[in-house]
Amino acid sequence: MPRGLELLIAQTILQGFDAQYGRFLEVTSGAQQRFEQADWHAVQQAMKNRIHLYDHHVGLVVEQLRCITNGQSTDAEFLLRVKEHYTRLLPDYPRFEIAESFFNSVYCRLFDHRSLTPERLFIFSSQPERRFRTIPRPLAKDFYPEHGWEALLMRVLSDLPLRLPWQNKSRDINYIIRHLTETLGPENLSESHLQVANELFYRNKAAWLVGKLITPSGTLPFLLPIHQTDDGELFIDTCLTTTAEASIVFGFARSYFMVYAPLPAALVEWLREILPGKTTAELYMAIGCQKHAKTESYREYLVYLQGCNEQFIEAPGIRGMVMLVFTLPGFDRVFKVIKDRFAPQKEMSAAHVRACYQLVKEHDRVGRMADTQEFENFVLEKRHISPALMELLLQEAAEKITDLGEQIVIRHLYIERRMVPLNIWLEQVEGQQLRDAIEEYGNAIRQLAAANIFPGDMLFKNFGVTRHGRVVFYDYDEICYMTEVNFRDIPPPRYPEDELASEPWYSVSPGDVFPEEFRHWLCADPRIGPLFEEMHADLFRTDYWRALQNRIREGHVEDVYAYRRRQRFSVLYGEMLF
């Protein structure tokens, strides 16, 4: 390979990343217009388009590099020099951290995810830690209550770029002050002030004002979800001021925010104070930089692995028929490998399973489906694998494993946030906790269905409970669109013997679902059945599901709230907003 090409290749990769992130910002910048026009279908399409941008631009760069090198193979020394030149381009580059991830992606595409070593890739960042901690320009504006909180909030809302009229701005300001007074007390509130992000965070049908409530005793989140009425008038639906509430809003089971972030590292650093429980990977994920979030997630895994003496074990819960799931006992992720062969009742292919996971990645997850990171040729040290798990891997997924002596390589896997399986949770709780879990499960089903997602397999074992007590779906192999399902009533038996027969007396076609049957497995436990009948009996009715289908087919997009209904101002303070 001719010398001098290394710099050209490094520059080509960085220019390719520039093009990708420019398009990323372009799609993101359209969020305000989509919100103001209430074009919710365009919101959903923009979310999918933005996710696809990264892989598309990686592919373009790979083709450019093949042209530059005339398709010639490259030796290890040449690749090391390319990385060296690329590293020299980064000190003055504002999005250096994501540019490193883009380099990794191009390398993996060129070499089929092989030879993934720290010498060839940016396994850890090449840049000093201070670059992540320095915010080069203000990302937020401070507001002080010199003339009281009513005047302060009027300035905050008047500063917003939204061009729609307010339904009743004074009412909303009074609601916020009332909430803050109840939360902090009048004296603390008078000594507090706000710091508000310059950019709004758009997601679904809301524009979120994200800020920090700086009080004498510490800094709290300050989150205002701004919605619009059917008449196109703005209103604030609630005010959230706890880290737990903020964590749910920025949760791993939600779609990525559209927030204009030319300096993503700076925004992540600014958010860290109000989201102390979130990892760096989760913060990048929340603002839509999902590929760099994957890099950070892998780094978090490596750091944990270096500091622990644990071995991977099979994850707790009922063993899956499609996925083999394992974990490190102290690490909050699970690793999911598609089995070589599925249980007989699972009539599907591995390609179908991967397509289902991609559907979830691109769809609105409404806070009820866990996000995943997909890895290829994932290397594990054998010393980190328990003998029982190694035996299970070779038994269930041998075709996806390459033995390298002291290591194994798993050809393909997913990494996902670990939760307590709902079936285990229900065995361990009682009283109000049990009631809350059943309410959450039913709400998860409803919200998924309203977002045009039918889980397929609704057994409790396919759902998990987060640290905030939310129920989240995580088994995607039978997932499909609501509009693809044929919901049917079970026909009455022709003869008394029909009900005793081992086979149904009626025909069943692919896609047929009988909601009456849900009762058999969801209400079998006498502790759970009465609660389910009380709160979610309509899930057993065909007309409920068909009505949802009709709304979806008519183009209706449901509101999605990242907080409880009882937290809405209309419920707290009594006035219906629309």
From Swiss-Prot:
InterPro entries on file:
AceK_kinase (IPR046855), AceK_regulatory (IPR046854), Isocitrate_DH_AceK (IPR010452)
- Has UniProt tagged this entry with the keyword DNA repair? no
Q: Which GO terms describe its molecular function?
A: [isocitrate dehydrogenase (NADP+)] kinase activity; AMP binding; ATP binding; phosphoprotein phosphatase activity; protein serine/threonine kinase activity
GO BP terms in the entry:
glucose metabolic process; glyoxylate cycle; tricarboxylic acid cycle
Is the keyword Transmembrane assigned to this protein? no
Annotated Gene Ontology cellular components are: cytoplasm
- Sites binding ATP sit at A315, P316, G317, I318, R319, G320, M321, K336
Q: Where in the cell is it found?
A: Cytoplasm
Keyword line: ATP-binding, Cytoplasm, Glyoxylate bypass, Hydrolase, Kinase, Nucleotide-binding, Protein phosphatase, Serine/threonine-protein kinase, Transferase, Tricarboxylic acid cycle
One Pfam family of this chain: AceK_kinase
Q: Where is the active site?
A: D371
**Reaction(s) the record says it catalyses:** L-seryl-[isocitrate dehydrogenase] + ATP = O-phospho-L-seryl-[isocitrate dehydrogenase] + ADP + H(+)
Enzyme Commission identifier(s): 2.7.11.5, 3.1.3.-
Main location (coarse class): cytoplasm
Q: What does this protein do?
A: Bifunctional enzyme which can phosphorylate or dephosphorylate isocitrate dehydrogenase (IDH) on a specific serine residue. This is a regulatory mechanism which enables bacteria to bypass the Krebs cycle via the glyoxylate shunt in response to the source of carbon. When bacteria are grown on glucose, IDH is fully active and unphosphorylated, but when grown on acetate or ethanol, the activity of IDH declines drastically concomitant with its phosphorylation.
Q: Which family does it belong to?
A: Belongs to the AceK family.
| Record's protein name | Isocitrate dehydrogenase kinase/phosphatase
Q: Which organism is it from?
A: Shigella dysenteriae serotype 1 (strain Sd197)
